[in-house]
Swiss-Prot record:
It comes from Rhizobium johnstonii (strain DSM 114642 / LMG 32736 / 3841). This is Aliphatic sulfonates import ATP-binding protein SsuB 2. ATP binds at G47, R48, S49, G50, S51, G52, K53, S54. Residues 15-231 form the ABC transporter domain. It comes from the Bacteria. The gene is ssuB2.
Amino acid sequence: MAPHPGKLKPATKAVHVRDLARRFATKTILDGVDLDIEEGEFVALLGRSGSGKSTFLRALAGLDHGVEGTGTLETPESLSVVFQDARLLPWRTVIQNVTLGLTGASGQEAGRKALAEVGLAGRETAWPNQLSGGEQQRVALARSLVREPALLLADEPFGALDALTRLKMHDLLRELCARHRPAVLLVTHDVDEAISLADRILVLDEGRLIEDLKIDLPTPRDHGDPRFAQFRIQLLSRLGVELPGRKAA
């Protein structure tokens, strides 16, 4: 069975992974993954469909019980997960969704503050079905950060949103992470999204990390910056995308 994530001691890395493997029946999904993520670092994970991205995130979150696996996996005790589907409980109000597990006046105050941070002040008593898709993801972000996690895991959180809403959510996530300073692992198919947000970008291919790229661009990122374009070309090549006049790596 897959090992449960261990708890990190204070002043260590937010994520420590060594030789991580995961298998489903006879198929190897993760094959000897090594990774460290520093406290407060924003890391994006790219890869083609079936490369093992979501399996890796679920392993970090401790959500892969019953899956065969080996390796060392250490994460902080306080972590939150955001998925593409906001996964709000339809029978609870917005603030009730945000404050699940929190009690008393302090919990309500923390919930109101979290909703204000994501631009939803005054929507505390709304029902999830009264919100747009983008607003539902804002609630999911508020819920994930209300407990000040040391690690935020995000699995394609904006994949179902339209292009304009995605850009707005990029700005919001950047602001929230700068304020709360969790370590972040963002799983995405969107190369530009990864470059726009991350300090480092990883590429996973057939269960192995084949790229670990530091993004040394000022924020907010300018898509017209020639260096942005160069990072895009390099990453697309590692993802097997052939560009005119170039061969994929």
